[in-house]
Design a protein with these regions (language model features):
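Walker B catalytic acidic pair
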Residues: 193
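Active-site-proximal or metal-binding-adjacent scaffold patches in catalytic folds
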Residues: 1-188, 197-232
Length: 232
């Protein structure tokens, strides 16, 4: 079920979309256009959703101000580092690259935001394809003593989660948007998914395993929230 409505939060009025899903917690995303997307368990009421939004006022206001425009002269984040963004005309084919000086998007039409967004997303995917297998190889020895098999890895652009897994297929899936966050955030997500090979639910035993593998996991899980506004 989908509900669309508006809500005054502080001095601003926000449009929000609310969907009930088979999940256990309320989730919030601030879209690039400033609207809000909320997903909730089936039993949650509209009153509870709006109270949840009011409680997240500071996050919403901060995220709304930081929305990513991908305009020339603005900035993007790569592995947690803020880097200047340059929009340049493409001479042959449009493409994107990361240099020491910043991130470059070579475009056919400078005012075409869709082209910039697609190039940016492709850049994150290509970077993830290069870096994340190395992250898994580095972290696997931490999980191996617990009997976790070496998994296959898939990469996807996802809206509602940073990672997922299918232990029966020995598979983990990582969100390509993790490229924008510090590598320690990706470490936390990878180890989180590997712990699900040992415990399918978020039980006490699950978090005990995760705490052994990465004692500071809470810090990096919390840090990931800062990068949600940059997920286009």
């Amino acid at each position: 079920m989908k509900t669309t409505d508006t809500l005054r939060i502080g001095e601003n009025v926000y449009e929000y979309e609310w969907r009930r899903k088979p999940i256990k917690t309320l989730n919030l995303r601030v879209r690039p256009d400033g609207s809000l997307y909320v997903s909730s368990p089936p039993f949650v009421s509209k009153k509870e959703v709006e109270r949840f939004l009011q409680e997240r006022r500071l996050f919403i206001e901060k995220a709304s101000m930081r929305g990513l425009t991908l305009a020339d002269g603005t900035s993007v984040h790569i592995f947690g580092k803020e880097m200047p963004l340059f929009i340049e005309p493409a001479t042959r084919r449009h493409h994107a690259c990361i240099t020491e000086n910043g991130v470059y998007l070579y475009v056919y039409e400078k005012d075409n935001r869709d082209e910039r967004v697609n190039l940016y997303r492709n850049l994150l995917k290509e970077t993830a394809e290069h870096v994340f297998p190395q992250v898994l190889a580095r972290l696997y020895p931490v999980a191996a003593p617990y009997g976790v098999p070496y998994p296959q890895m898939k990469l996807r652009r996802m809206r509602s989660r940073w990672g997922s897994c299918m232990p029966t297929k020995s598979l983990i899936t990582l969100n390509t948007y993790l490229v924008i966050a510090p590598l320690s955030c990706t470490d936390q997500v990878v180890l989180h998914e590997l712990c699900h090979f040992l415990e399918p639910n978020h039980s006490v035993r699950f978090y005990a395993y995760l705490s052994r593998m990465m004692p500071e996991w809470r810090r990096w899980r919390e840090a990931l929230k800062e990068y949600t506004p940059y997920c286009l």
